[in-house]
From Swiss-Prot:
<comment type="similarity">
    <text>Belongs to the CFAP53 family.</text>
</comment>
<protein>
    <recommendedName>
        <fullName>Cilia- and flagella-associated protein 53</fullName>
    </recommendedName>
</protein>
<keyword id="KW-0282">Flagellum</keyword>
<comment type="function">
    <text>May play a role in filopodium movement.</text>
</comment>
<dbReference type="InterPro" id="IPR043597">
    <property type="entry name" value="TPH_dom"/>
</dbReference>
<feature type="region of interest" description="Disordered">
    <location>
        <begin position="462"/>
        <end position="482"/>
    </location>
</feature>
<feature type="coiled-coil region">
    <location>
        <begin position="9"/>
        <end position="40"/>
    </location>
</feature>
<dbReference type="InterPro" id="IPR043596">
    <property type="entry name" value="CFAP53/TCHP"/>
</dbReference>
<feature type="coiled-coil region">
    <location>
        <begin position="152"/>
        <end position="413"/>
    </location>
</feature>
<keyword id="KW-0969">Cilium</keyword>
<feature type="coiled-coil region">
    <location>
        <begin position="67"/>
        <end position="124"/>
    </location>
</feature>
<dbReference type="GO" id="GO:0003341">
    <property type="term" value="P:cilium movement"/>
</dbReference>
<dbReference type="GO" id="GO:0031514">
    <property type="term" value="C:motile cilium"/>
</dbReference>
<keyword id="KW-0175">Coiled coil</keyword>
<keyword id="KW-0966">Cell projection</keyword>
<dbReference type="Pfam" id="PF13868">
    <property type="entry name" value="TPH"/>
</dbReference>
Length: 482
């Protein structure tokens, strides 16, 4: 029976253990507060150090800028002094004799004259070349074609660049949406992880509280068993003592009664002590449970506030994103409209210029055709006039021959001799005319060869100009003075 009884100071030891546990919790809380204070102090110190470093860097850059400015000023001052010294030396060395100055002036005048003549020749060549380029219809046609081809190529290049730019913008938007989706998934995963960790923490706290409640209940059950065992032992002792003292004398019975009264008083006091300890334990358990419940409620309120704040931030973020996308869409549409309008205006202007050029070219060709028709009519008139002259000469020759024959039949030998002489003169004239016709034919052949040679030179010049020059960016209308 004595072996199963708990030591008298068991409850005191348990109270001391509980007090030590509470003291340890308070010490841990103080250590945690101290660590938080140290972390805040380190953060403030780091911020101050960074600010000092930035200020030092700013001061160093400012000092270096001032040093560079002073160095540049010194270099400029040295350069000015050197130029001043060189100018003084040049002024001192420029003192020459009148003969030297006259010779230098003459040499300079000859050099300027040669330079001016070279510039005049170059300007004349340039102006001749420019006049040839502007007055050559073949070059104008080729340049018009080259400008048209270049315009088409540039327009195609701009269209391709615009399409590539739109494709790149679409790809950037797609990548941006993908990145936004990835970030959103990461945020949701972090939120779920935080929720899981909070749930695990709450479960751990509940498990610890359940373990503490179980231990408290076990301690209560053990204390109750000890009390019941002690009461049963005391009752058994009392009954044994009462049974042993029944046969004693009255004094012993009185003593036993006094002892029983003292024992009852002891039991009452003991019972009061046990009730006070139970009440303290229950109040402590209730206090611990209330603190745990209040902490859990505070955590849930903080979590709800955090979720509401994150939801508000996501809503504002989506609204800002929608506004940015709408603004970008409006700017893109407006820019495309301006580009299309400018392109249409440019095409209309180019079409008007091409129509004006075609009209000017058509008028020029009409004028050239009219001039050629006039020249052809003049040549035909000259040929008809020459044919009439030849016919008149042949008729005159026939008349003269008939007259000579009639005169030859009527006249004597002297007249025949004169007729023969005139015939010889006529033959000489005919031979001379034949020679003149041959010379005219040779002259026409020479003119044709010269014309062909000039045309070949003209074609070579055109080809050389086309290969050595670029088409003009703007080819305006010329005024022709025929």
């Amino acid at each position: 029976m004595n072996k199963s009884r708990a030591p008298p100071d068991a409850r005191i030891q348990k109270m001391r253990e509980l007090e030590e546990r509470l003291a340890n919790l308070k010490a841990d809380r103080k250590v945690e507060q101290k660590m938080v204070a140290v972390a805040e102090f380190e953060a403030r110190t780091t911020k101050k150090i960074v600010g000092n470093l930035v200020q030092q860097r700013y001061d160093a850059l400012k000092a270096r800028a001032e040093a560079d400015l002073n160095a540049r000023r010194q270099r400029l001052a040295d350069k000015l002094d050197a130029e001043d010294l060189a100018m003084r030396q040049e002024l001192l060395a420029s003192k020459k004799t009148p003969e030297q100055r006259r010779a230098e002036l003459a040499e300079r005048a000859r050099a300027l004259a040669a330079t001016r003549e070279a510039e005049r020749q170059a300007l004349a060549s340039t102006l001749y070349e420019k006049a040839f380029i502007q007055s050559c219809d073949v070059l104008r046609d080729e340049n018009s074609k080259r400008i048209l081809y270049r315009t088409i190529e540039e327009r195609n290049a701009q269209i391709e660049h615009k399409m590539a730019q739109r494709i790149m913008e679409a790809e950037e938007k797609r990548m941006w949406h993908e990145m936004s989706e990835v970030e959103r998934q990461k945020m949701e995963q972090r939120y779920l992880d935080d929720k899981r960790r909070d749930r695990e923490k709450r479960e751990e706290v509940l498990r610890i509280l359940d373990e503490q409640v179980r231990q408290v209940n076990a301690r209560r059950a053990e204390a109750s068993m000890l009390r019941r065992a002690e009461i049963a032992e005391l009752n058994a002792t009392w009954r044994q003592m009462a049974a042993d003292q029944e046969a004693a004398d009255v004094q012993e019975r009185e003593n036993m009664k006094k002892l029983a009264a003292e024992l009852q008083e002891f039991n009452r006091i003991k019972q009061m002590e046990i009730s006070e300890a139970e009440r303290s334990e229950r109040e402590l358990d209730l206090k611990i449970l209330q603190e745990a419940l209040s902490k859990e409620a505070a955590d849930e309120a903080a979590e709800l506030a955090f979720r509401e704040r994150r939801r508000e931030e996501m809503r504002r973020y989506r609204e800002q994103l929608a506004l940015m996308m709408e603004k970008e869409r409006e700017e893109t549409a407006e820019r495309d409209a301006l580009i299309l309008k400018a392109q249409l205006e440019q095409e209309a202007k180019r079409d008007a210029e091409l129509a004006a050029r075609d009209e000017a070219r058509r008028q020029l060709m009409a004028q050239v055709d009219a001039i050629r028709q006039i020249q052809i009519q003049e040549k035909l008139a000259k040929r008809l006039e020459r044919a009439e002259e030849k016919a008149f000469e042949r008729a005159q020759m026939a008349e003269e021959v008939a007259k000579a024959e009639s005169d030859a039949a009527a006249k004597d030998a002297a007249d025949r001799k004169a007729g023969i002489q005139r015939r010889l003169e006529l033959q000489t004239m005919m031979v001379a005319k034949a020679h003149m016709k041959a010379a005219e034919l040779d002259e026409k052949l020479a003119e044709g060869e010269a014309t062909k040679r000039v045309e070949d030179q003209f074609k070579a010049k055109v080809n050389q100009t086309l290969s050595s020059t670029d088409p003009p960016v703007w080819h305006g209308r010329r005024k022709f003075d025929w």
